[in-house]
Design a protein with these regions (language model features):
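Bacterial N-terminal signal peptides
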Residues: 10-20
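Bacterial N-terminal signal peptides that target proteins for export
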Residues: 1-12
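Extracytoplasmic Gram-positive cell-surface binding/anchoring modules and repeats
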Residues: 56
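Conserved beta-alpha structural segments and adjacent helices that either
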Residues: 23
Length: 195
């Protein structure tokens, strides 16, 4: 009887996971590209201007000098994208200056260690300080596998600006269900400990 209850509970958790991941999790759709808004992009060059409005006739508000700098697209207007950086600066950039390459910026107040595994007790492979720009190789629900030069490792999403909290990047379809399953089991176990 106990085995049947455990099996039933696992089936229910799996069913909830399937429903959760098959629902539309997107925000708006951009009228120019058909892509999700908001979404993250990065700069293509070491010299890019953010303008007050969507035209070269508008004054330059900010000048970025760092290739791969992450930006969040908030709106689309013809060839222009309204973007925001991690410091909450907002302006317009021409679409030719941005790329779909996913990068993030470390927002920790101190050095945050990269993890070889996506657990807190994983092997430390290096340390990375705030304001470093990293490539987002892949992301699970709570962790991203990032690279910076020769260093690669897992880091908690809470320390990265440039990825949505529940966003999955380059992870197989079934990995999502496995992660959600184990997260649900852990939550259920914690809940049962309270009784």
């Amino acid at each position: 009887m106990l085995l049947y209850k455990n099996f039933s509970m696992h089936i229910i958790i799996l069913f909830i996971a399937i429903i959760t991941f098959t629902q539309n999790t997107y925000g708006e759709i951009g009228k120019e590209t058909g892509l999700e808004i908001p979404r993250y992009v990065s700069l293509k060059s070491n010299d890019a201007n953010i303008r007050v409005g969507p035209s070269r006739n508008y004054p330059i508000e900010i000048k970025y000098l760092k290739k791969n700098y992450p930006l969040k697209v908030l709106e689309e207007h013809q060839e222009w994208r309204k973007v925001e950086d991690f410091k909450k600066n907002i302006g317009w950039i021409h679409k030719s200056l941005i790329s779909g390459t996913r990068t993030g910026i470390i927002i920790s107040n101190d050095n945050k260690t990269l993890k070889l595994l996506n657990t807190l007790d994983g092997n430390v492979v290096g340390e990375i300080g705030k304001d470093n720009i990293v490539y987002l190789e892949k992301c699970k629900i709570d962790w991203c596998f990032v690279s910076l030069g020769i260093f690669k490792g897992w880091i908690d999403k809470n320390f990265i600006w440039g990825v949505k909290q529940n966003e999955i990047i380059k992870i197989s379809f079934f990995q999502r269900f496995e992660d959600l399953y184990w997260k649900s089991i852990n939550t259920l176990n914690e809940f049962q400990k309270g009784f």
